[in-house]
Regions:
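Canonical Rossmann dinucleotide-binding motif of NAD(H)/NADP(H)-dependent dehydrogenases/reductases
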Residues: 3-40
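A glycine-rich helix->loop->beta "capping" turn
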Residues: 62-65, 85-98, 104, 117, ...
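Catalytic loop of short-chain dehydrogenase/reductase
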Residues: 102-106, 114-120, 144, 148-188, ...
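A short, exposed helix-loop element centered on a Lys and neighboring polar residues
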Residues: 136-137, 180
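Flexible cofactor-recognition loop at the NAD(P)H-binding site
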Residues: 16, 38-39, 95-108, 156-157
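Conserved amphipathic alpha-helix within the SDR
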Residues: 56, 60, 67-70, 76-91
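Active-site Tyr-X3-Lys motif and surrounding loop/helix of classical short-chain dehydrogenase/reductase
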Residues: 81-88, 107-126
Length: 203
């Protein structure tokens, strides 16, 4: 039994870590899974292990169908093109896993606010928060054409506890609020929007 057979899913940030794991499980459940990332075979970001092509191979090894689309979600035209590709090839989108977080390039330094570079804001809010926001902006019109749909944002949240890094805390809580706001705005469209915190992962 494949509970997601016939469903179309998009997982952003699918090269490694949570994005890869989610994409693989969606594939196992029968969904056709599009995944985006900057790391492709032969050109991995920062030479880190894992690419979207590797994720496709893992999905296919489990009997699923995966489609890799190279995308830098800080570039709106690339993000828009991903959604256009899904519309053209599938005619719909049922599930959006908004997992992109380009701030891995910067890392999370455990320093007081006044010792941190303002680059933390630029990176975490551009490659993290805005990247997820832009993906929603382009994907929601397609999701709204369904009778029902699902958006999941991956983030880091621990019952209002401070994460220990000023900019990281701001960015991750912004994503939680993004999910909350969208859940209210999209309720009439029967689109569920959730923020999921799998815990801190350095991937």
């Amino acid at each position: 039994m494949k509970p997601l057979k016939g469903k179309i899913a998009l997982v952003t940030g699918g090269s490694r870590g949570a994005g890869r794991a989610i994409a693989v499980e969606l594939g196992k459940a029968g969904a056709t899974v599009y995944m985006t990332g900057r790391s492709i075979r032969g050109a991995s970001t920062n030479q880190w292990p894992g690419t979207i092509d590797d994720t496709v191979s893992q999905i296919e090894a489990s009997g699923g169908k995966g489609i890799a689309v190279r995308c830098d979600h800080t570039n709106d035209s690339e993000t828009e093109a991903v959604i256009a590709k899904i519309r053209e090839e599938q005619g719909k989108l049922d599930i959006l896993i908004n997992n992109v977080w380009g701030a891995h390039d910067l890392g999370v330094e455990a320093k007081p606010f006044w010792e941190l570079s303002l680059k933390n804001w630029d990176t975490m809010f551009t490659a993290g928060v805005r990247a997820q926001l832009a993906t929603n902006h382009f994907a929601v019109p397609l999701l709204r054409e369904n009778k029902q749909a699902l958006i999941i944002h991956t983030t880091f949240w621990d019952e209002n506890k401070y994460t220990g890094q000023f900019y990281y805390d701001l960015a991750k809580n912004a994503i939680v609020r993004m999910a909350y706001g969208l859940s209210l705005e999209l309720k009439r469209d029967n689109i569920a929007v959730l923020a999921v915190s799998p815990g801190f992962m350095r991937t």
